[in-house]
UniProtKB/Swiss-Prot annotation:
Swiss-Prot/TrEMBL catalytic activity: uridine(55) in tRNA = pseudouridine(55) in tRNA
Protein's name in the database: tRNA pseudouridine synthase B
E.C. number: 5.4.99.25
Listed Gene3D superfamilies: Pseudouridine synthase (3.30.2350.10)
Domain of life: Bacteria
UniProt keyword annotation of Isomerase present: yes
Keywords: Isomerase, tRNA processing
Molecular functions (GO terms): RNA binding; tRNA pseudouridine(55) synthase activity
A Pfam cross-reference name: TruB_N
Length: 318
């Protein structure tokens, strides 16, 4: 008698998902692992993150799905804001709490000395990338050299620190710390900054907490945890995504009529009479189907604006 086989449950097919998940990444997760988990929960065909956030760090990790991936580079280039806790008096091999202790020094720091040290790092500064970073040297991430006990030459990189605000201090305790908010350009290493501030104070330091609170114009307001995404009903998870144009809110908005929309979607340049002073790029909205019952304006893409001419750059197909 043939053995009865129970059919395996069918997995839902991958589907077109378009939008941005403002993920509040938990500690201990790599950015790629968080992306893979979210992609699986949404059954999305296409996804990408907008720059790595260390496993040690928590906070805002925008994940782009579908057509939103066309604009992920804009967030890679965007300014960032972090909140971090620096433990003074101890220097480690990784500039964070996961490394080996390299040195311990007494801490004798006044609030005035702290402010003076911090002020030295506001503005354009040169940073040497840490060995424990994902930056590549000869095609290999620096952290792989570090794990093998090797140190390689790294060129200093110019970054901009827009502001450093002191949120809290605990300078007199047995484990002195300072909590900072840092607004900075892309490519800034907060671990290196914390270590350098410690050296400027004469006692050394390392990060014990790091949280990203802003990327470009995106903040933690409305951010979603992996737990919340997992707990949501499968057919309700898509509603947790922000629309594609959440990535484009800093660009001026241009609306086209049905004929202009059709030409734009065919990649044609459009001479227009528009008052757009100081704008060189715009987000474009228009009608995709003029004969549809609901012919409302939707995002068509991003265009260059120069000399009164709209030139399509990145088209969106929703």
């Amino acid at each position: 008698m043939a053995e009865h086989q129970v059919p395996r449950p069918q997995k839902p097919p991958r589907r077109d998902v378009h939008g941005v998940l403002l993920l509040d990444k938990p500690i201990g997760w790599s950015s790629n692992d968080a992306l893979i988990r979210a992609k699986r929960l949404l059954w999305a065909k296409k996804a990408g993150h907008t720059g790595t956030l260390d496993p040690l760090a928590t906070g805002l990790l925008p994940l782009c799905f579908g057509e939103a991936t066309k604009f992920s580079q804009d967030l890679l280039d965007a300014d960032k804001t972090y909140e971090t806790v620096v433990r003074l008096g101890i220097r480690t091999s990784t500039a964070d709490a996961e490394g080996e202790v390299l040195s311990e020094r007494p801490v004798s720091v006044t609030p005035e000395q702290l402010q003076a040290a911090i002020a030295r790092f506001v503005g354009e500064i040169d940073q040497v990338p840490p060995m424990h970073s994902a930056l590549k040297k000869d095609g290999k991430p620096l952290y792989e050299y570090a794990r093998a006990g090797q140190t390689v030459e790294r060129a200093a990189r110019r970054v901009t620190i827009y502001a450093i605000d002191v949120l809290a201090t605990d300078l007199q305790s047995a484990e002195p710390t300072v909590t900072l908010r840092v607004s900075c350009s892309k490519g800034t290493y907060i671990r290196t900054l914390g270590e350098d501030i410690g050296e400027a104070l004469g006692c050394g330091g390392h990060l014990v907490a790091l949280r990203r609170t802003q990327v470009g114009n995106l903040t933690l307001d409305g951010a979603v945890t992996l737990e919340a995404l997992d707990a949501a009903a499968e057919d309700a998870r898509g509603a947790l995504l922000a629309p594609v144009d959440a990535l484009l809110q800093t660009l001026p908005r241009v609306e086209l009529d049905a004929q202009e929309s059709r030409r734009f979607l065919h990649g044609q340049r459009l001479p227009l009479q528009l008052a757009l002073p100081n704008a060189d790029q715009v987000r474009v909205y228009g009608v995709r189907d003029a004969i549809a019952a609901d012919a409302t304006a939707s995002l068509l893409g991003v265009a260059a604006w120069q000399g009164g001419v709209l030139r399509p750059e990145r088209l969106v197909h929703l």
